[in-house]
Amino acid sequence: MRPSGRTPEQLRPITITRQYTCHAEGSVLVEFGRTKVLCTATVTEGVPRFLKGKGQGWVTAEYGMLPRSTHSRMHREAASGKQGGRTLEIQRLIARSLRAAVDLTKLGENTITVDCDVLQADGGTRTASITGACVALADALNWMLAKGSLKTNPLNFMVAAVSVGIYEGAPVCDLDYDEDSSAETDMNLVMTETGKMIEIQGTAEGEPFSQEELMQLLELGKQGIQQIIQHQRQALA
């Protein structure tokens, strides 16, 4: 039995609130149960130096957690002037996932930066960030289209993510903190709405997992992501 009483395939309640802030070209508050992440997409003219003159754009991301987004206060990374390894890993994952969905040649020499700020953490902050970031990105691209900065929409498909794992010997989907902290296997999946994989991150925290269990987790995650993308599409409708 899962601590929350959910069935193995059951996701936490998901809410996606668009236009959550008034300044950003795209802004979304995404909630997976008690995990809440604010995702804002900012459009700027120009591209990084390595892309200048190539006629394409760039999509990047930053990730951070508020000091009291967790059970006890975390040290604010900005105060130390250095981002931690986990932060860098997650923001690169978010950026890679978003770029996989975009035709950068249709973006022109523009950059979209998506900031993902965790307001409250209860497991799955990186997967919630990717899910919300894609909606914020879609809104930013629609803003550019309405402004006349783009001729066609560069977004090829939606992207979403979910965590899966083996908890007390059983495969489960969308782990909360209680499950994640004691899972035998922890895995993050990023997929497109067409069912293709973008990233698989998996680790046996306790007992090694079999190929059969891996396939079960992938199928569980695929089903979960299909439901999450429905939430994205409903939010954008």
From Swiss-Prot:
Q: Binding positions for phosphate?
A: 86, 124-126
Q: An example of a Gene Ontology BP annotation on this entry?
A: tRNA processing
Specify the superkingdom.
Bacteria
A GO molecular function term, named singly, is: 3'-5'-RNA exonuclease activity
Database matches in SUPFAM superfamilies: Ribonuclease PH domain 2-like, Ribosomal protein S5 domain 2-like
Q: Which UniProt keywords apply?
A: Nucleotidyltransferase, RNA-binding, rRNA processing, Transferase, tRNA processing, tRNA-binding
Reaction catalysed by this chain? tRNA(n+1) + phosphate = tRNA(n) + a ribonucleoside 5'-diphosphate
Q: What is its EC number?
A: 2.7.7.56
Question: Function, please?
Answer: Phosphorolytic 3'-5' exoribonuclease that plays an important role in tRNA 3'-end maturation. Removes nucleotide residues following the 3'-CCA terminus of tRNAs; can also add nucleotides to the ends of RNA molecules by using nucleoside diphosphates as substrates, but this may not be physiologically important. Probably plays a role in initiation of 16S rRNA degradation (leading to ribosome degradation) during starvation.
Q: Which HAMAP family match?
A: RNase_PH (MF_00564)
Similarity field: Belongs to the RNase PH family.
Q: How does it assemble?
A: Homohexameric ring arranged as a trimer of dimers.
User: Which PANTHER family does the record match to this protein?
Assistant: EXOSOME COMPLEX COMPONENT (PTHR11953), EXOSOME COMPLEX COMPONENT RRP41 (PTHR11953:SF0)
What is the name attached to this protein's record?
Ribonuclease PH
Q: Which organism is it from?
A: Tolumonas auensis (strain DSM 9187 / NBRC 110442 / TA 4)
Its taxonomic path starts at: Bacteria, Pseudomonadati, Pseudomonadota, Gammaproteobacteria, Aeromonadales
